[in-house]
């Protein structure tokens, strides 16, 4: 999709929001296939992922991209009585799903393939795509709700869903409806299979734990007790808000699809997954502060929102009395001068260098734990190694600062 095609697509969205009849005519499977096949052009980050991802083969990646409209069509079969409902879900999906780096979808496929027997790959391929898109759809649900709560303006290089002219307050209904739609897709594809209850449990646990993480994160922001930020609190938020649904969730889906889910496997995924999620959260926090907004496709607002982020935790740990006073007076405020004060404080404390150092130390620690796994562990050590390395190298951070 080139620049002209993207502008044409955006213009069509505005037209379609006003003209439901036009929408029913234009949103066809063929159109959606073309859209999803080229969704990498929606953001620089997604283009980088398509070019450089090594989670799965390029053929698998292409088939995965093309499977979304088929999954949507099947999922909407029982809702043909309401074209408006179908149109709204298609539009929400087209705008919010698949335009990022697709970490969770790719991770789900990588986990599924690593656990499959060779003779199962053809049989389970479609189901693997369904679970991968289910993970991405769940991610989209959380991003849209998070953007509403945070007052974010852009996501993946485009205006946030809740700020679109024809959305506004209806974004709450849209997200609730979309979450239920994900459950409907699971029922349609897996409802008659033995693994269905386990898949439902995994999705429900992911929703619940992530919401708890978001609640705790919001509580930390709202009470403004910034000097109480500690590494322990930071790790707790990360484990619930990021670790489970980013890393553990996709791997558990792979285990369930391949009938290898067990309490022992769950505990191993939880143990290593907590640290991997923490690694990803540290990377996200770094990029919120030091990343390129154009490349990342979103505005960084952790300082303004008063988030319990890695830079904030380090600052509280290292600051002297005077610096803590500056931190308390300016952190969690939206005025430009306050944000600048915090950035200057971070520079004085060399936060950028310390973030890089701590991220590297955690990565090395995770690798050592994986190397110590037994050869017959489930999931296997090579799966953890592949996923950790992909996550660690996911963002092309310009490390001009020496660790």
Describe each model-derived feature in a short phrase:
Residues 1-52:
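N-terminal mitochondrial targeting presequence
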Residues 60-68, 178, 207, 242, ...:
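Hydrophobic/aromatic residues within well-ordered alpha-helical segments
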Residues 80-324:
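Mg2+-dependent prenyl diphosphate-binding active-site environment of isoprenoid biosynthetic enzymes
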């Amino acid at each position: 999709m080139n620049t002209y095609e993207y502008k044409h697509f955006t213009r069509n969205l505005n037209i379609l929001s006003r003209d439901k009849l036009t929408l029913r005519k234009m949103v066809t499977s063929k159109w959606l296939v073309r859209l999803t096949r080229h969704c990498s052009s929606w953001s620089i980050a997604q283009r980088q992922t398509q070019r450089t991802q090594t989670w799965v083969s390029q053929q698998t990646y292409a088939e995965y991209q093309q499977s979304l409209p088929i999954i949507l069509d099947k999922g909407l079969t029982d809702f043909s009585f309401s074209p408006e409902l179908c149109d709204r879900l298609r539009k929400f999906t087209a705008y919010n799903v698949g335009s990022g780096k697709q970490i969770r979808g790719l991770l789900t496929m990588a986990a599924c393939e690593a656990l499959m027997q060779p003779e199962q790959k053809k049989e389970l391929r479609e189901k693997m795509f369904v679970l991968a898109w289910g993970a991405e759809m769940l991610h989209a649900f959380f991003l849209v709700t998070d953007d509403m709560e945070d007052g974010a303006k852009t996501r993946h290089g485009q205006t946030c869903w809740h700020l679109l002219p024809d959305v506004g307050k209806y974004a709450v209904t849209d997200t609730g409806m979309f979450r239920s739609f994900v459950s409907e897709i699971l029922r349609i594809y897996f409802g008659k299979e033995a693994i269905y209850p386990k898949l439902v449990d995994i999705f429900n646990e992911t929703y619940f734990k992530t919401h708890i993480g978001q609640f705790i994160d919001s509580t930390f922001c709202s009470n403004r007790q910034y000097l109480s930020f500690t590494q322990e609190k930071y790790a707790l938020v990360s484990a619930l808000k990021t670790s489970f649904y980013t890393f553990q969730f996709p791997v558990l889906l792979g285990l369930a699809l391949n009938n290898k889910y067990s309490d022992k496997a769950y505990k191993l995924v939880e143990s290593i997954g907590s640290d991997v999620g923490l690694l990803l959260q540290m990377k996200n926090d770094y990029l919120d502060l030091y990343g390129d907004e154009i490349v990342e496709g979103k505005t960084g607002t952790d300082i303004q929102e008063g988030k319990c982020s890695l830079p904030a935790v380090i600052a509280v740990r290292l600051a002297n009395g005077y610096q803590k006073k500056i931190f308390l007076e300016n952190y969690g405020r939206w005025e430009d001068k306050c944000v600048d004060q915090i950035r200057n404080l971070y520079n004085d404390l060399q936060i950028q260098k310390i973030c890089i150092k701590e991220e590297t130390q955690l990565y090395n620690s995770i690798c050592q734990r994986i190397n110590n796994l037994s050869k017959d562990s489930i999931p296997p050590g090579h799966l953890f190694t592949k996923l950790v390395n992909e996550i660690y190298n996911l963002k092309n951070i310009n490390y001009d600062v020496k660790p």
